[in-house]
């Protein structure tokens, strides 16, 4: 009370400007103190001055929230039981104040990032029900999908809905679950493409022999880390939906929803894609959906699916015509790369190896970081070992070519690096041994493959 009176007197005699300036000066001093401590991870010492600034000048500086998040997390980890309980509540509330006072950064909204961080911490700290967590994730995605990019949080956005669905909650239907999966999956693809665009600039420098700057190397490490995270969580996302998206579930679901959505290009495209990925394309419903999609809105996707239909009917020439139409209808180079890759997969399945490699290489010309295209080519080479070369040594030498190609996949695409290196090692294990090289006297020689491969590989040195 005494302090309150003194403040009122000060207000009366000094005026609001001077009083607020003094308060602000104290806040600035405390801001400096807690920020310096937080920078060196002395979060315990940062707590009290941070709390004062947070209470008295919540709009002073965004550091109140960026460092505040770390300070409270440290308190949750290292504080007393009472401190931990209070800090958990304070941390969740911090995100709401963050949005209130600093919803943007450099003129761009950060609401999606902040809210998704709040939802993730609600999961980590077991604060709130699955429905409450999902509501926060959904608000983040609905209000600001652009800054909602964290792979782990995107995955948990869908997984939370999946958990609600599996709990028997009638508010979440199978149709809603699949729709949300498609949304989140497409978001992952968007983020992967954004990373690929940045990475490809660096790869082109490498390919041209230009030395990478320190900044380029740092960016490459960041891109590789993020690309790997996207790969891991997208794989986990697909694993969850795989449990539900059997043909037995998909076909009756899409049959019941077709009439309502036959003029909805987004729905038709997603339904066709899901049926294709789950190998339900032999069902007549797939034909119905694809033909409706192409009639409604001819696109790269619809033409691609028509190519598949004609391949299944053994109309190879017509299938290829639709595949080419698919490529011509796509203007975005990264989407074009994905379409070319999908066509390469279809051609590989039909045993048309040379054509499949051609399409895979075209895909790489649009997206040099598309590692799975290199893996596809490596597999094409490895599967031709018995068909290329006149001697057993030369036949097995194909595996060196396959291994080299798989290693290219690992070099350009961190999201599949582990699998690509494992594949390369497997191929090398099937190639001629050092004893074979010595016996044949072929160290450093070139082995040329006159089959469809039409290239050569250098025998390793002993």
Describe the function of each predicted region:
Residues 1-27, 69:
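Bacterial Sec-dependent N-terminal signal peptides
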Residues 22-285, 421-427, 441-462:
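Preference for long, solvent-exposed alpha-helical segments and helix-linker "stalks"
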Residues 35, 60-61, 70, 111, 120, 147, 159, 264-265, ...:
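Residue-level recognition of tetratricopeptide repeat
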Residues 50, 88-91, 95, 137, ...:
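Hydrophobic/aromatic packing residues within the alpha-helices of TPR/SEL1-like helical repeat arrays
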Residues 53, 98, 140, 292-293, ...:
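Canonical positions in the second alpha-helix
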Residues 56, 101, 143, 295-296, ...:
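Structural marker of alpha-solenoid helical repeat scaffolds
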